[in-house]
Structure formats: C-alpha cells, structure tokens
C-alpha cells in the first residue's frame, strides 16, 4: 500500500483493538469528512512533489513557494478549525475523548505548517489537539526526524 488513507484504514481493520473509527454511522461520516479536509484539500497541494515542481519546473522563488504553501494550509486549517469547533465532542482529540483517523491525518500537516512558519494563533483547537497527540509515544516515534529515510 502506498496511500496514507488506505494504509491507515488497513491498519485500523487489521488491528481492531485500536479502533480509529467511531462505532456509530454519523460519527464515522464526520471522521471521514474531517480527515478528508486534510487528506484531500490540504495535502495534495502541499506535498513534496508539488513543492519541487513549483521550484524546479516553474522556477518559483523560495518566498513565493512558501507563500503558496502557507496560503493552502491556512485555507485548510481555517475549515478544519471551524468544523471541529462546531461539532467537537468533549475531549482532547478531534472527535472527543478517543484518538481517531482525523488526528492521524492532522498531525503531519501541523508538522509541515510549523516547518513553513505558519502562525498557529488562529488555531487554538488544532494546537491543543497537536499538543495532546505529541505527548503520545506513537506520535513521537512517527516524527519525520525519527524515520530511516529522513532528509
């Protein structure tokens, strides 16, 4: 498998004791909606392949490339922050008390947003979720610096 969402769903189904999807159909749909804001609206415009294309093929200056990144992450984070605020269940994660697929999609984008110096002042909910997730060992072990192929 090579696509993040397919990998996450595969692992969720293979190891059901972790259960990244809520049991009820409404919250399952909500998880998919929130996860897709990140996976479909933010990530495709800001992945490494796109950023390299902007730089190497279109000769976009670094400042303009950074502005591109910031524009699209801000658009996505605005939508995500507002969506979570409107429907957030009580708890430290995107869907309340339990870690979900949404959190797994959010944290890598938060990492990239910091890397591209996106201000988090307008995203208190996302920032609090990030803080909670990064306190977990699994998220600490998954940071890019800890990966064997880190650049």
Regions found by a protein language model. Give the residues of each.
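Short, solvent-exposed alpha-helical surface patches in well-structured domains
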Residues: 30-33, 128, 141
């Amino acid at each position: 498998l090579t696509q993040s969402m397919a990998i996450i769903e595969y692992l969720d189904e293979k190891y059901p004791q972790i259960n990244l999807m809520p049991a009820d159909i409404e919250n399952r749909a909500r998880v998919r909606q929130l996860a897709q804001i990140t996976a479909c609206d933010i990530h495709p415009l800001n992945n490494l392949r796109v950023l390299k294309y902007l730089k190497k093929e279109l000769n976009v200056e670094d400042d303009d490339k950074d502005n591109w990144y910031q524009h699209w992450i801000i658009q996505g984070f605005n939508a995500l922050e507002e969506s979570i605020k409107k429907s957030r269940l009580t708890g430290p994660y995107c869907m309340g008390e339990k870690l979900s697929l949404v959190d797994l999609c959010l944290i890598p984008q938060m990492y990239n947003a910091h890397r591209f110096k996106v201000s988090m002042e307008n995203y208190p909910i996302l920032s609090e979720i990030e803080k909670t997730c990064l306190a977990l060992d699994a998220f600490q072990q998954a940071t890019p610096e800890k990966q064997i192929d880190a650049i």
